[in-house]
Each structure stands twice: as C-alpha cells, then as structure tokens.
Curated annotation (Swiss-Prot):
Gene3D superfamilies: Vaccinia Virus protein VP39
Binding site for S-adenosyl-L-methionine: T143, G164, D186, N228
Family that this chain belongs to: Belongs to the methyltransferase superfamily. PrmA family.
Gene name tied to this protein: prmA
Protein name listed in UniProt: Ribosomal protein L11 methyltransferase
Length: 292
C-alpha cells in the first residue's frame, strides 16, 4: 500500500508539539530527522536530544488529502512554515531493509554476516547476526574498531566482559575467536534478549552469561574488558569498568568522538598504560593494559 509523507519543519522546542499534531491529524507514525546538517552525539541524562532545526515526518495513508493538514500547520505556525509532501511508492520495506546489511570483514579472521545471507568464507570466523532491537551490527565505526581490536588478540582460554553488550556482537565475536567465557552486561532488557538470541544462533549460548547491572557477578575480574557505549557513561563509570579488569589485563573503550578522547585518556590513565587513540572517521577507540 502506498503512503504519503508530510514533512513539517520545527525547532527543538516545538518538535514534540508538531509530532502530537501530526498524530492527532491521523498520522500512522511520526519520525524526526535533522533539517540541516547538525550532528547530535549524546543527550544529557533524562533528555531526548533533538536538532535545533528538526523535521517532523508524518506517515499517512495514501487516500488522505494533505491540503487540510498543511493548512492546519500554516494556521498555527504561519503561512511560511516549511513543509514538504511526498508520495511513497509501494515497496517490500522488510526486503529493502534486509538488502542494506551485507557481510563485513574485520581484521584478518573475522566476518560479521546477516543471518539471512550466505557466509563469504566458510573457513573464516563467522558471526551470524540479526540486528534486532539493539545497537551493534558492525556498520558503525565504533563497533568496527572494537571488532578489529578483538580480531588482533589471542583470546584462546581468556575471560572477557562486554560492558554494554547491545546485540551481543562483541561478546559473540570474542567467543568465536576463542574466548573461554564471556559476560555481557547491559541496562536494557531488550539488549539482553537480542544478545541471547544471537548467541543461540551462533552456538555459543552456553559460554555467554548475560546480566542486567544489578545482577552481575560481584568481585569478578576478567582478562579483557570491552565497552562500546558513550563518552559520558565511560567517564562516570570509569572506576567500575577498570575494576572489572585483572592486573595486566586488557581494556578497550569506544563510542568516543576524537574530540572526547584526550579527557578519557587522562581518566583511564589512572589504572591503565594507555595506547594512542585508534581513529575511524570522526570516532575512536582507546585501549590499554591494566597496571599491576
């Protein structure tokens, strides 16, 4: 079934109001996008961060007449309110989405493959993944940086903590690369469920332990810890994350912009001999060895 998109430009302050109006006028769904080209990286605690110039996009059935809807917004926000009306052709959107994800190689041994595709190299270390509801498909630079780091390590017989496990991509990759035991921790129950599903898909569910933070093992230290989250939590939880690493163990953190790296290098240098940042696009990974 074809659809109509009605796009109304708003500000960060008026975007929620515009969204509610679109829903009240019969929109089946409303999404936000940047009306300019302004990146938003990290909201404050409890804040839903929006762009200064935000475009609200209402999705309507094709038989809906857009003229009265546009007139409604012109009445409320002025005749010059920016808007756009588009007819969306009928497509198999699930198939379109699935076509977007292709197998990807990280380092020398590791491939991340959507579960609905054939693996390019059956002799490689292949992780089959469904993105599900949790972040982490390998397409984001921070995930790629962590996967490359894991591929570079000798993980045979090692224990590892994936702090903020998301889809489970890093935890599962570590197990497929030879880790003996991996603990995944996440604040989101949906992430725990996605990690569990992906672990079963890859035949490593017996080796992967998944916990919400309040349930994680006490006084446990791993040979290796990886945390691909955001700069704010990495800073605030630095003591907790560092405490998960054994003396002389390894740690990698990502989800960090290049501009945020110097501060976090200083923070983690309390506990680790840190290496220079590894950069990809505008993001970076920091890694180091725990001081004895």
């Amino acid at each position: 079934m074809p659809w109509i998109q009605i796009k109304i430009n708003a500000t960060a302050k008026t975007a929620n109001k515009v969204s509610n109006m679109l829903m009240g006028l019969g929109a089946q769904a409303v999404t936000y996008m940047d009306a300019q080209d302004t990146p938003v990286y990290e909201p404050l605690p409890g804040e839903t961060k929006l762009w200064g110039d935000t475009r609200c996009i209402g999705l309507f059935d094709a038989e809906v007449d857009p003229a009265p809807i546009v007139a409604f917004f012109q009445q409320h926000f002025g005749e010059d309110v920016p808007y756009q009306v588009e007819l969306l052709e009928d497509k198999d959107w699930v198939r379109e989405w699935m076509e977007h994800f292709q197998p990807m190689q990280f380092g020398e041994r590791l491939w991340i493959c959507p579960s609905w595709r054939d693996v390019p190299d059956p002799t490689a270390v292949n992780v089959l993944l469904d993105p599900g509801l949790a972040f982490g498909t390998g397409t984001h630079p921070t995930t790629a940086l962590c996967l490359q780091w894991l591929d570079s390590l000798d993980l045979k017989g090692k224990t590892l903590v994936d702090f903020g496990c998301g889809s489970g991509i890093l935890a599962i990759a570590a197990l497929k690369l030879g880790a003996e035991r991996v603990i995944g921790i996440d604040i989101d129950p949906q992430a725990i469920e996605a990690s569990r599903d992906n672990a079963q898909r890859n035949g490593v569910s017996d080796q992967l332990e998944l916990y919400l933070p309040e349930d994680q093992p006490k006084n446990f230290q791993a040979d290796i810890v990886v945390a691909n989250i955001l700069a704010g939590p990495l800073r605030e939880l630095s003591g907790l994350i560092s405490g998960l690493v054994k003396p002389h163990g390894l740690m990698a953190i990502s989800g960090i912009l290049e501009s945020q790296a110097p501060e976090l290098l200083e923070v983690y240098s309390q506990w680790f001999a840190m290496n220079p940042a590894t950069e990809r696009e505008e993001w970076c990974r920091l890694d180091g060895i725990k001081k004895g």
